[in-house]
Amino acid sequence: MTYLLFLKMAEERATRPLNPERLVPDEFSSHQLLGLSGEVLEDTYNHILRGLASQPGVLGAVYRGAQNKISNPSHLKTLIVDYIDKENWSAADADVNGDAYEELLERSAGDTKSTADQYFTPRALIQAMVEVVQPTIDDRVVDPACGTGGFLLAAHAHVSRDAAGFTPPQREHLRTRFVTGVDIGATTSRLASMNLLLHGLGSISGDALIDQRDALIADPGDRWSVVLANPPFGRSSSTDIGGSADDGAAIYRQDFLVTTSNKQLNFLQHIIAILDINGRAGVVLPDNVLFEGGAGETLRRKLLTAFDFHTLLRLPTGIFYKPGVKANVLFFDKRPAAEQPWTRRLWVYDLRTNKHFTLKKNPLRREDLDDFVASYLPGKARDKRAESERWKSFTYDKLIARDKVNLDITWLRDESPEEADNLPAPEVIAREIVEDLTAALVEFEAVAAALEARAAEPEPDAPDE
């Protein structure tokens, strides 16, 4: 369905009165399907899919491997005539348009999410994160686990509000170089490319803005001034069926501070590596990043000393697809090397205690984050911040003195019992325990191997007297 919707919206871009842009060659456009039925419709649609797959550049990448999975021609005609073609998608309100298309994207990636444990980020949270990080036209924004591109589109929309005053080079930068996405999944990468093209980012003939690869495997060499991300939770680095690296395997990189199989810690290390000096990051990470010992403690010390780790947003449960997920948003800035710690004070906002959300009946809305955004004081000096019931600050000395630098900080009393609806199923809990134990065993084996190798080294000869 996303292929058909892309064709229809591409046709609308080609025929709009102002600044028409043809993304798809006319011979493969959606109007070629109108008025057809039966086998002729099916054959024509298959011809269009094959033709688009053979195109160079981003368009070919989007349609490569595309297949018509609607086996009944009458169903295909109904979908085209009664749903896709009767709507003028580009004339709809931009937010409604984006919601509709991204809902289709998420439906298309539904199997991927449930199978590979990928977490699509609530739009309200994306918007709030972008508002406080405040990307500008001078930035380059990257999401190393971009999914269908939600963070990238939100950052682009935020900066585009001032587009009327941009110079031609700035407009070109905004369209072709402002955002970059990386995702390991073939499906999600393709959907992200389609999403960006339909929102006016990139070009059919230009370089792809979405790179399909495992972001954790190697340092890309490039650096970005803004990182916005919600890396997939779980132990492997996969976010798509069939696209996994070795599940549970430790990642060895020279630019990493520690070697671990914990995917969230590795994504944090990767983001630390690709963030430019004075760059800003907003990253969604699970609770274990705040309290896990060993590699986790080492990275927390690094964040507090070599970075300005200034804000922590404790997220409520019930906002992700998997019940019971407990996560946070870490906001930090990369600073030049210095003798003194860069973090002076960590501000923590508790949006979790006594807050109850569900995906359908009580979803997280943008207004639920109004107080956090107001407390953050985007663009203003952080010494102007003022504490409140849910908003407290902690000095570097107090943080570094905590046992194992545990940053799992709470102070509000939880007055409600744990809701059964927010608890994972027993088999899910059991599987997560197995994954944690397996990952811990891998790390212990690596430590043991290193110790054995060190013990096997010959002792240096004693100096002559």
Regions found by a protein language model. Name each.
Residues 1-137, 204-215, 314-317, 342-358, ...:
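Non-catalytic, mostly N-terminal accessory regions of nucleic-acid modification and defense proteins
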Residues 6-10, 89, 105-109, 157-160, ...:
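Non-catalytic alpha-helical coupling and interface elements of nucleotide-dependent molecular machines
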Residues 96, 100, 121, 125, ...:
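Helical mechanochemical/support elements of P-loop NTPase systems and associated helical scaffolds
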Residues 97, 104, 108, 189-191, ...:
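Long, contiguous hydrophobic alpha-helical segments, chiefly transmembrane helices and signal peptides
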Residues 115-229, 234-236, 241-243, 250, ...:
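Conserved S-adenosyl-L-methionine
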Residues 165, 243-244, 305, 452-456, ...:
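Short, intrinsically disordered/low-complexity patches at protein termini
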Residues 217-224, 232-399:
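Signature of N6-adenine DNA methyltransferases within the class I
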